[in-house]
Curated annotation (Swiss-Prot):
GO terms for cellular component: cytosol. This is Tryptophan synthase alpha chain. The keyword Lyase applies. Gene3D superfamilies: Aldolase class I.
Length: 268
């Protein structure tokens, strides 16, 4: 049983959904980033979704673009990212860790090499934002070879053909988009998602986590009531980091408070 399966089983037994925060590794700097990731887990995050800093994050709104720029300015390289992940993994043996990234970073040292490094660091899943299902074969093959779960996005406008491919190729969880467009807490999630969740279930897709525009506990509760296995929040988390750049201690306190409130909303 992989870590995602074990997590969803535990949460189901406890009548809870998953709360999964997203942060960019190395934002605002590698040392504080490590403290941030651990704080999120300690405050109740069920899993982590992590971005590797990239200079041209197409699917991201201004908040996460800012996080990428801060991490790159702090000299965060893929090597440093994997080192930080390995440290988080050593401290948290059961917490699923997912990467959400762009294909260029996977290609940089070869696809196999990338997934092998993921395996070594303790990564559970990889979602490549700019690779659709019909171009995913080399990535899926490498993921399977190294025991990594390939994650795919189910957009709200998806055809049955796309959803079938997402269900067949995806492992771990399905990233369910609450709306089209770029990431950002400024743009609210479009509920309801019942119909899309029902279609995913028909195709026997992995459990769905709802993302894009999730910034408050009521949305988490809504997502779980609609049938999602949980919710992912990125821009709202990164916004807290951005707001408290000059006060690292306050930054951690505010992140913990936000995570606790969001996690509380997952209790069915």
């Amino acid at each position: 049983m992989n870590r995602y399966q074990a997590l969803f089983q535990r949460l189901s037994a406890a009548q809870q959904g998953a709360f999964v925060p997203f942060v960019t590794i190395g934002d605002p700097n590698p040392e504080q980033s490590l403290a941030i990731m651990q704080t999120l887990i300690d405050a109740g995050a069920d899993a982590l979704e992590l971005g590797m800093p990239f200079s041209d994050p197409l699917a991201d709104g201004p908040t996460i673009q800012g996080a990428n720029l801060r991490a790159l300015a702090a000299k965060t390289t893929p090597d440093i990212c994997f080192e930080l992940i390995a440290q988080i993994r050593a401290r948290n043996p059961e917490t699923p860790i997912g990467l959400l990234m762009y294909a260029n970073l996977v290609y940089a040292r070869g696809i196999d090499d990338f997934y092998q490094r993921c395996q070594k660091a303790g990564v559970d899943s990889v979602l490549i934002a700019d690779v659709p299902t019909n171009e995913s074969q080399p990535f899926v093959a490498a993921a399977e070879k190294f025991g990594i779960q390939p994650i795919f996005i189910a957009p709200p406008t998806a055809s049955d053909e796309t959803l079938r491919a997402v269900a067949q190729l995806g492992k771990g969880y399905t990233y369910l988009l609450s709306r089209a467009g770029v990431t950002g807490a400024e743009t609210k999630a479009n509920m309801p998602v019942h119909a899309l969740l029902e279609r995913l279930q028909q195709f026997d897709a992995p459990p769905a986590l709802l993302g894009f525009g999730i910034s408050e506990p009521a949305q988490v509760k809504q997502a779980i009531e609609a049938g999602a296995a949980g919710a992912i929040s990125g821009s709202a988390v990164v916004k807290i980091i951005e707001t408290h750049l000059d006060n690292p201690a306050k930054q951690l306190t505010e992140l913990a408070n936000f995570t606790q409130a969001m996690k509380k909303a997952t209790k069915i």
